[in-house]
Amino acid sequence: MNIQGCTVLVIGANGVFGRLTAEKLLAMGANVIGTARSNESAANLPGGLTQGLLLDLESAESIATLTGYLSTSGVQLDGIINLAGVVGFGSTSDTSASDAQKLMQVNHLGPSAVISALLPVLAKSEREPFVLSITGVVAEKVFPGMSAYLTSKTAHSTWLKALNLEARRMKIRVIDVRPGHTETGLASRAVFGVAPAFPQGMTAEHVVGKIVEAIVSGKTELASTDF
């Protein structure tokens, strides 16, 4: 796939993965629309974006506003990249329903709602349209002390597999990306609990390089072993 000239929506472009991915796509000649959750976090969006938009994945109103705008503005999307996410730590018995719901909403329900609403826009693309979402090694392996996070990411990975089958008729490629632990600082920003001691992870630059390579080369998944 030739990235130059494509218009790509990057959800979570203010985060480490999102910002690096947006910058790499911009350097390759893409038009990038990036989202951030709030005006405060929008300060971390990269320069050079075609548009910077607000998207709170915990707000149905925010999701409807963004998808409604992109569906009616005349913007032709060629790709959607979801790199937003939150993490929490704790045993099953110590994790509250509200904490588990927050992870499910941000990591799965919110992104899937955005992607689903924008599929008709993507389907009009003549540039090999694609959806890419990051789920992680936790969608392949079970780890103790993070059941709510595992559940949210596994749910999203399963949803992506189903979407891949359904989107074929629209000629939309779906890419599930499952890197192992990466040094983005996410674990230190857990919405609940305290992260265990992880071994040294991969660099975010390495993971983003693999992500962009997967888009260009036509892959439909990047397993943890591909990193």
Where are these regions (language model features)?
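Catalytic loop of short-chain dehydrogenase/reductase
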Residues: 123-124, 130-155, 160-161, 165-168
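Rossmann-fold cofactor-recognition segment
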Residues: 47-61
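C-terminal helical subdomain
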Residues: 169, 176-177, 192-227
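N-terminal Rossmann NAD(P)H-binding glycine-rich loop of SDR-like oxidoreductase domains
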Residues: 14, 22
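Conserved NAD(P)H cofactor-binding loop of Rossmann-fold oxidoreductase domains
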Residues: 83-89
